[in-house]
């Protein structure tokens, strides 16, 4: 799995010279190409067939991080899910002294930790990483919980706004629907990076776009037809423009690289050759974000895909 953040040109372009939306990092000369550490026991030789040698462990997952750094990847996603595997923030802390260049994209499910203590925890990690920390804001359900989408995004909004107060102000004064704080000093939660780590965010619903456009830095998407990706970029950019902001954009993709397309398709068939449809559905449904709008769009895309699944 690879994450690519588009920030290489004056404007993001898809298909020839067509300009889509302005971006924040227009002065950079390369896109951020990132990797993925399989913290949630999802590293398989054959999809859906557990392999003891690839089971999520500190040794296996940290070796992925070190190898990604050796190959020059700029960032690496450390996902979060209630499955057999590694706790995200603990794992990132462990990687601080064994890496030097690669950034860590830590997935944080908003509400799991009290927001002010979360601000301090992230600030501590940011210092341990010497500023090589980025945060993927997650709004999915907690284990054993089913909450309405509107509530989950409101919770994420309030957590993000509290984090920003903690990282940019002298005191936290916050009056939200879920959280209320007054007169708390922010001295314990000052990060290494000015204003805190960059916030990456993915979501397709109107509350998700509003939250990302107002407060986050990178909007993450999944593979879809080009016209749909363009539409999503324009939608979140419209929100950002209301707040006189711009964003960068990222695409989460699974890539199989071979010398020819025929060889790539052959390997794609190989790695799914032992996966049963019912078990694949079970894997998807056990994730905390299985009922999200974005996941439902991916399911729709699978239904209209060709025999190779794309």
Stretches with model-predicted labels:
Residues 2-99, 175, 192-197:
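N-terminal beta1-alpha1-beta2 module of alpha/beta enzyme domains
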Residues 69-70, 92-100, 122-132, 213-214, ...:
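Acidic (Asp/Glu)-rich catalytic clusters
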Residues 165, 217-218:
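Well-ordered beta-strand positions
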Residues 72, 95, 125, 163, ...:
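Conserved, mostly hydrophobic/aromatic
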Residues 4-42, 149-192, 224-310:
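An alpha-helical appendage that flanks or caps ligand/catalytic pockets
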Residues 31-37, 76-78, 104-107, 133-137, ...:
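Hydrophobic faces of well-ordered beta-strands that scaffold small-molecule active sites
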Residues 79-87, 111-116, 225-230, 257-259:
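Acidic-and-aromatic substrate-binding clefts and catalytic sites of carbohydrate-active enzymes
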Residues 57, 61, 88, 118, ...:
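Aromatic/hydrophobic pocket-lining residues that form the small-molecule binding cavity
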């Amino acid at each position: 799995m690879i994450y690519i953040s588009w920030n290489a040109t004056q404007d993001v372009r898809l298909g020839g010279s067509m300009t889509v939306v302005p971006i924040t990092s227009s002065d950079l000369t390369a896109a951020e190409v990132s990797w993925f550490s399989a913290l949630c026991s999802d590293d398989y030789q054959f999809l859906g067939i557990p392999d003891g040698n690839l089971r999520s462990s500190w040794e296996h997952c940290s070796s992925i991080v070190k190898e990604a750094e050796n190959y020059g990847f700029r960032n690496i996603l450390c996902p979060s899910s209630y499955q057999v595997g590694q706790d995200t923030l603990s794992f990132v802390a462990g990687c601080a002294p064994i890496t030097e260049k690669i950034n860590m994209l830590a997935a944080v499910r908003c509400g799991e930790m009290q927001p002010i203590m979360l601000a301090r925890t992230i600030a501590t990690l940011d210092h341990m990483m010497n500023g090589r920390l980025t945060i993927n804001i997650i709004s999915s359900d907690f284990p054993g919980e089913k909450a309405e989408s509107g509530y989950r995004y409101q919770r994420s909004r309030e957590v993000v706004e509290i984090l920003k107060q903690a990282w940019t102000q002298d005191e936290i004064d916050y009056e939200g629907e879920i959280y209320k704080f007054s007169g708390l000093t922010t001295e314990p939660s000052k990060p290494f990076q000015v204003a805190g780590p960059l916030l990456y965010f993915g979501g397709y619903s109107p509350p998700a776009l509003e939250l990302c456009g107002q407060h986050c830095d990178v909007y993450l998407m999944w593979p879809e037809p080009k016209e749909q990706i363009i539409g999503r970029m324009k939608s979140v950019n419209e929100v950002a423009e209301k707040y006189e902001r711009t964003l960068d954009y990222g695409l989460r993709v699974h890539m199989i690289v071979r010398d020819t397309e025929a060889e790539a398709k052959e390997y794609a068939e190989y790695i799914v050759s032992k996966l049963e449809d019912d078990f694949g559905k079970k894997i998807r449904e056990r994730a905390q974000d299985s009922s999200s709008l974005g996941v439902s769009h991916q399911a729709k895309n699978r239904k209209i895909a060709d025999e190779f699944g794309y």
